[in-house]
Amino acid sequence: MRAAIGTLIVATSIVQLANGFFGTFFSLRVAVEGFDATLAGLVLSSYFAGFTLGAVRSDRIIARIGHIRAYAAFGGLVGAATVVMPLLVDPYAWMALRAVVGFGCAGLFVATESWLNAKAPPAMRGRVFAIYMVGTFVALAAGQLLIGGIDVTASGPFNAIAALFALALVMVSFTRAEPPQVSRAPQMPFREIAQAAPIAVAGCALSGLIAGAFYALVPAWMQGAGIVRETIALFMFAAVAGGLAFQVPVGRLSDRLDRRHVVAALGVGLAAVAVALVFLPRSLPVVLPVAALLGGFMSTLYPVSVAHANDRMPPDRVVAVSSALILLSGIGSVAGPLIGTQLMVGFDINGVLYLMAGAALLLAVLAVGRSLLRAPPAHRARTFEVLTPQAAPLAHDAGGHDETPLAGSDRADDRAARRS
């Protein structure tokens, strides 16, 4: 059992290595092609659109055909779309193909995480998902470092990415882990969340907008500004590594304080760092620590917002709540590159940084305002979890049963069992 679980985690880390590399490489490649600003924004946001759709719909495919065949189907979609892209260098074709990649990646994560959740022993589940998330962040960060030694204009990077996805598919196909039975996730309660935890709604949507604009547009701008790819790779690596470093301390802080105050502080910090990047000297020793801070603030807005929603919602709604918040974050991620590319026409990269700062400050103001109107909950059924909507977890629940609801997140029952 442990070997099978390890295989699933390693396979997902390989997927994230490919995904982290693909995201930054594709941003650079779109910049090289010189598409119109609006078309470039649509192409860069199409991955997030596909990912969002996959996060909320792939459970139907998994429930219909089972985990292994669904994983093979999703992996095949991603690999095929990736290989075709250098053969069809057209913005409209790339929009469709990149959306297919996003949908397939979401399906891979949902299949893997629901499988892990159902099969990991309850006493080990927390450790399993901790290792899973660390592997996710490390692989995403390592993927950025691959940018330094590639020819952006060649088809080789597309082939290498497809090969990594194929390797993950082969590993999962040979696993001996028995796939779980699955059931449908309940309907997403948008109105309930908006009434119970409006800051969670705003936080997930705005954090998606901020992250989408950053990861899609900043690498492309850096290349256009004549910055060498090795420096781009280090900058993006620092941002992802900062996101990992912030998870535990911010999580502990949010478990002790009103989470809305933590959201407000993160928003102010992110805005300050984004504006600082406008004025600071753009030398590597100065920019790398700032990139790590930016990544830290940016990567913790979403999980704190999700934790705030879980504080306000009944335990039996957590799976549906998580799915709804992923969708909201995805909508924000689609909007980020679209708005950012238009701002870059008039303000260059400063437009993107001001967009990020403005969205973060708006969230901070909303969080402070709500905290003045409503007291925090007296009891919290859940603690902070390391989450990112473009990575994981998308599909683990609390029950430890073989019949696993998909497209959400809930480990409360496991924690309650350990406390009793």
Annotated model-derived regions:
Residues 1-48, 200-203, 212-221, 225:
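Helix-loop boundary and gating motifs at the non-cytosolic
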Residues 180-190, 370-420:
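Intrinsic disorder in cytosolic terminal tails and internal cytosolic loops
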Residues 37-38, 122-132, 229-230, 313-325:
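Loop-to-transmembrane helix entry/capping segments in MFS-fold secondary transporters
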Residues 147-148, 160-182, 363-374:
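C-terminal membrane-cytosol helix-exit motif in multi-pass small-molecule transporters
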